[in-house]
Structures are given as C-alpha cells and as structure tokens.
C-alpha cells in the first residue's frame, strides 16, 4: 500500500473493507456473505459519497481491501486520575481500596500535573484512532474541582472531548445542593454531562430522585457509575428501571459498569434490561478494570468475571459500548487508550464473536454514546471523514495483531503506526 502525504487533504479511499454494521441496508455482498468493498469520497473533510466497488478507483487512495473502521470512540475514561500508578498503589484489593488510594494521591493534583497527564492520554488516544472521548472527572464537593476546568483547556488533538461530573451520590441528598451542582455543570459549556457514583455503600433513593430531577431541569444528559459491584442487593439499576417506567427522562442516559446484573439471576435482569431498552439507555461495560477490581482479594484467584450482561443487553435491544475506564492508576495499573485492547479483553472475558463485522460497533458507535440520531451512520454523506485503517490485519485475527494502523481525521492522514515504530505518528 502506497501512503499518501500527511499534509495534503485526501480525495477519498478506495476498496476499503468496512464493517457490516456500519453499511446501509441493501449493501451488496459476495458469495461468502462478506460485504463488497467500498469507495469513500471526501470533500472538505467530510464524506461526499459511499459506493460499493470491486476495482480501484483512479484518484482515490487504494486500500486493497484493508479493514477500515470509522473513528474510534472511547466512551469512559478518567483523565484526572490517569498515569498516577507510580505514586498511587492501593494496599488492598478491590474498588473501595482503590478509591481510598486515589484520595491519598489528590495532594499531587496540581494544575500542571493534571495537564501533563491528561495531555499524554489524549495524545495516545489520538494516535490510536480515537476521535471521540468521554472523561469522567471526580467532584469531591458541590464546587467544581480544578481538574474540571483544566481538562476543558486541553488541546484535544482532533478528539471531540466530553466531560462528566462524577459526583458521589450523597452530595445529591440536599435538593438545593443537587440543583447547584447541576447548574454548575450546565453553565460549564458544551459537551458536559452530569454523573454520579451509585453503590450499595452510599445508596440513597431520595438522592437518586434529586439527581435525575436536577439533570432534567438543567437539560443535562446523564452518565452514571452504577452498581459497580457483584452484589445481589445493589439497588441502582433496579431503582432506575422502575423510576423510568413512571417518569421518563427527557435526555439520554448512559449506565457505566452495571456489574451487579451478572450477580443476580436472568429473571431479575430481564425486566431491568427491557426498561433500559424502552428508554434508550446505553450500557457501557468496562472489562479491564472490572476484571481487576471485582471479586478481588490479594493472593486469591477470582471466581467471578465482573462483566455486565453484554449478550443479554444486546438481545434485549439495549445499546452497548466498551470502554477502557482507568489507565495506569490505583484502579487499573495497566490499561491503554487503544479501544482495540479493550475489545480484545471483551473478546475473551465476555466471549464475543464476529468481532469486526458486528462487535466493532462496541468501540465505534457514537450514537450509542450521545443518543443523537445524527451520529447513527458514520459513513453517511456529510459525516466527518474519520477512518482508521488496519493494513496488516484480517477479519479472523482482528483485533489481535492489529497495532499497525493509519488514522485519517477530517480527511487528512494524521497518524501512522507501524510495527517498526509502534508509537510513531505524523501530524
């Protein structure tokens, strides 16, 4: 494959192997059922045409059948905590011990420290092909922390960045305080959401009511850390499903984690998933961190996986995504800002199949994250010309052995990652 200049805008790509889920209805297929290759024409950084093809088209960059995805989505990160593992190691296993270690590390969170770590995370994500990233930011009081504004000031390197105020549920106990938090988030500018940490250790139904009501009044979407535990008595998702059946929420809701669904029975989970589907709620699974933190005891092999019910959610019609969650901090000492690593983890932990043609949607589906119908067709005419090309892979091995990639953002080749220079990139 001949590489084009990284400076000049591309006119388009030819003979790209796109995933079946992202193609329009009626797209032609080969005898073996695979979709026909595609031409994508670009104009002014956007897609001007999508057409099936068998032959290279003059004037377009010929990919010769290389696997090609839309820009990748990172639906759940923590830019305020990232890259702190060298100074922040929990003394016990599990989620609550990691939270305690994180609080101990906060004394180091100067503006310069946050800017340095978060900028490095965004640079890695961009080099891996991420074009949309949502970061939760911890709020410790009703006032916005320094990290909230510091992350807003970052040079995102072509990534659309969203911020979620991650607020402990008890801070919503007082309706006046709940209103003040929601107002502060709403006044923070575009792409800001309200969130909450909802766990059996801090459960409060009245606070949940205040959280949803204040978000609705201020026209805020929600992204909740909810039921991040393997407990049959956790109440977050059960309460939310029942509440939505009586009081539909006007915005979009994402529920991150949901590990407790895997601790109960199928009969308990089914009505919850039906309600989530009926109200357009998205379920975000976070396999790397949940595998490390759930059923965790030092010196003991875990018996439970800690992954939410991905297959059952998909069967019920719930939109689903996979996220990296924590990267190199007290919650997850490893991790990366490469969604392919997350999907590979999901492949084994959740026993996913048909990875490229169907489950790649878990790391690309902006509509599932935002709730916006405008994001539903990534290759539609008028969509931004953002693609990630995997020249050395095939649909049977992908996402493994697929570190080499080429990133096109708004119609320009922005990053090149090859085997010999694994993290090299050109801008």
What kind of region is each of these model predictions?
Residues 28, 361-363, 378-427:
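C-terminal cap of metal-dependent C-N hydrolases
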Residues 40, 45, 65, 76, ...:
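Divalent metal-coordination and catalytic microenvironments
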Residues 166-175, 187-305:
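Active-site core of metal-dependent hydrolases
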Residues 1-56, 394:
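N-terminal metal-binding scaffold of metallo-dependent hydrolase/deaminase domains
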Residues 70-82, 137, 221-230:
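Histidine-centered catalytic micro-motifs
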Residues 68, 85-136, 142-156, 180-186:
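Alpha-helical scaffold segments that flank or form the walls of functional sites
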Residues 242-253, 304-390:
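His/Asp/Glu-enriched, well-ordered alpha-helical/loop segment
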């Amino acid at each position: 494959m001949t590489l084009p200049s990284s400076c000049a805008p591309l006119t388009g790509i030819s003979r790209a192997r796109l995933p079946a889920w992202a193609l329009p209805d009626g797209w032609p297929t080969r005898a073996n059922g695979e979709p026909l290759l595609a031409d994508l024409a670009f104009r002014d950084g956007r897609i001007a045409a999508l057409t099936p093809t068998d032959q290279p088209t003059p004037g377009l960059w010929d990919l010769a059948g290389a696997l090609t995805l839309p820009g990748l989505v990172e639906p759940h990160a923590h830019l305020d905590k990232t890259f702190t593992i060298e100074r922040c190691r929990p003394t016990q296993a599990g989620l609550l011990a990691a939270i305690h270690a994180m609080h101990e590390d906060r004394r180091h969170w100067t503006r310069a420290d946050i800017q340095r770590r978060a900028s490095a995370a965004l640079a890695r994500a961009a080099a891996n092909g991420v074009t949309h990233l949502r970061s939760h930011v911890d709020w410790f009081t009703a006032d916005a922390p320094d990290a909230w504004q510091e992350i807003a000031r970052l040079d995102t390197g072509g990534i659309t960045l969203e911020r979620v105020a991650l607020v402990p549920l008890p801070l919503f106990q007082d309706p006046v305080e709940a209103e003040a938090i929601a107002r502060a988030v709403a006044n923070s500018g575009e792409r800001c959401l309200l969130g909450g940490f909802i766990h059996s250790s801090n459960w409060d139904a009245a606070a949940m009511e205040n959280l949803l009501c204040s978000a609705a009044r201020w026209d805020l979407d929600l992204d909740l850390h909810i039921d991040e535990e393997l407990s049959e008595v956790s109440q977050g998702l059960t309460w939310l499903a029942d509440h939505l059946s009586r009081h539909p929420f006007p915005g979009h809701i994402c529920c991150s984690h949901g590990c407790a669904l895997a601790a109960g029975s199928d009969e308990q989970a089914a009505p919850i998933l039906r309600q989530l589907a009926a109200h357009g709620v998205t379920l975000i699974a976070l396999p790397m961190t949940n595998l490390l933190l759930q059923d965790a005891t030092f010196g003991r092999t875990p018996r439970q996986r800690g992954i939410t019910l991905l297959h059952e959610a998909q069967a019920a019609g719930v939109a689903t995504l996979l996220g990296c969650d924590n990267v190199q901090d007290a919650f997850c000492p490893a991790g990366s800002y490469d969604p392919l690593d997350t999907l590979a983890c999901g492949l084994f932990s959740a026993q996913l199949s048909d990875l490229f043609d169907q489950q790649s949607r878990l790391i690309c589906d902006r509509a599932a994250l935002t709730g916006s119908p405008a994001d539903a067709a990534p290759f539609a005419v008028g969509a931004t010309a953002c693609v990630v090309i995997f020249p050395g892979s095939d649909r049977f091995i992908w996402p493994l052995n697929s570190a080499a990639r080429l990133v096109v953002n708004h119609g320009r080749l922005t990053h090149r990652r090859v085997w010999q220079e694994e993290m090299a990139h050109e801008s």
